[in-house]
Structure formats: C-alpha cells, structure tokens
C-alpha cells in the first residue's frame, strides 16, 4: 500500500513538472514559465507611470519609466501605435538563448508605428574624439538576447547639437566578452542628421550601428541579424558594424583611439532584406567579423555625401557572402557602385 502511495505521489509530481507536447517532446514546466515572461505596455497619451504596465488598460506612459526597469528573459515591451516619445529609449536587462526580450508594437496597424525621437538627448559615454559625447534615440549597452522590431526611430533637431555625431539605434559592447543576438528587424529609421559629412566621413555612425569599444577585455558580437529595416535620410552610414578589436578602425574618421591591440572578430552576421535610401555614405558596411551573409538588400541613392564611398562594402572580414543585392542611384563622390 505504501509503495502504491509513493508511486502515485511521484507520478503526480512528474505530471506537474513535465508537459508532453503533441510531437512527443518533453518540456519542463519551469522552462514553459520562463518562456512566457511578462508583457509590458507603453502609451504616451493614456498611460500612467503609476500603473503596473502589464495590460493595455494599465499601460505606462514615459520612456523614463521604461529605462528604469530591468527586464527579464521572455518579457515583451510593447509601444502603442500612433504614439510618440521624445528622448532616449534604453531599457535594461538581457534575455537568454531561445528566450529573448522583445520590443514590439500594439494597437491598430493603420495608426502607424510607435515613434522614438532622440530629440537631442546626449550621453557621456561617447566615442566622439572631440566632444566625448554621443546622441542616439535607442541605446543598448553590454546587453544580449533582444529582438527589436516594429518601431520608428528618428534623431534630428535643428539646434547646435546637430554638430554632435548622432545615431538612430546604437548597440554598444565594451570590455564584456561575447554578446549574443541583439537583432533589429522591421524598423523604420530615418532622418538621423548631424555633423556635415564633409567634415568627417562618419564611419561607425549612422542609422543602425553595432559598436565595440574598449581595450581591456576582448569583446565581440555573435549571431546577429539585421533584417527587413527601412533606413532613410541618414547622412553617415545606414547599417554599420565597427570594433576596436580589429586591424583597421579608421581613427581619423571614427574617433576610436583606444584600440584593443589584437583581433577579436564578431561571428555570424546576417544583413538581409534591408532598404537603405538617401544615405550620405555606405548603405551597409560590416567590419571586423567572421562569417557574414549580406543578401537581398537595396541601396538607393546612397553615397550622396561629399566623402561617400561604395554603397555596400566590408572591411577586415572573413568568409563573406554578398549576393542578390541591388544598388542604384549612387552619388558621384568618393568610390562608386
């Protein structure tokens, strides 16, 4: 009798701990709970930062509330369509393999994308050789396992800050080792306008930028996808990867002076199905990597600045596949198509 009771208890525990999927795969309940995460909603019109943010009816309001929150694996951060925010979006935390944190939109698709306008926000951890500041609308620092999608990003104001080098989305790693899977998909990044390109070619700045800085601990990216983005009216680079842990970092143009003293390439980059239009320099330029797939991208009217160069090019890379891309309408300066 005691043996039957013990078996029944063990069987019950097994049923609680294990879920059997239709295909016969066994997944622990703990794993299922982690994947679920929490969905947070942000509404700049009807939200309130005193809310818990976990439903559309109890949405947060401000970027300040978002930036003060450390998100966990499986969480979703959802911005309401038709709303806009001015300032910096810089959420904290990291996801995990197979369980990223997601930025997405909610609401009626006819209302357009939620808009993040950098609007002259400046940080003090910059790489600018002259001013030691940077200006960006979206910023991640030493984080990994994020999916950034469905938002609109802009960063242009007609003020004295136009001479600060600007970014749309800046993803930075510094003295952190290998950082994985911060993916940017289906975003609209436009009007990232700053210092005139004639003064500096702006390598390492632009619409969507992955930047490795520092010289103390070798740092790189691994398994990064940039896909389906529309990048328009950017007077530096459209999509750019650059690192201090490479052989050539163009210090006169990028402002990078703290070279790592060795080579530590990023691995497995996918740059696919992006449309870059009216970009002052290159539409796409990865550097310091091993294994890159660059395919099905369009560069329309790029290389339009006085110091522009080839609309799609790469530097200090190994095992590059560049295929099925389209380039047209390039400017007359610098290198050509």
Q: Language-model segments: which ranges?
A:
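Bacterial N-terminal signal peptides that target proteins for export
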Residues: 1-10
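Hydrophobic core
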Residues: 11, 15-19
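Sec-dependent signal peptide cleavage junction
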Residues: 19-33
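Boundary/junction segments of secreted and surface-exposed precursor proteins
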Residues: 33-44
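Acidic Gly/Asp/Thr-rich repetitive segments characteristic of extracellular carbohydrate-active
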Residues: 42-80, 84-85, 89
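Right-handed parallel beta-helix/beta-spiral solenoid domain characteristic of secreted/periplasmic
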Residues: 78, 94-163, 191-197
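Glycine-rich beta-solenoid repeat tracts in large extracellular/virion proteins
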Residues: 87-95, 114-115, 119, 136-142, ...
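Right-handed parallel beta-helix
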Residues: 100, 144-155, 178-193, 218-237, ...
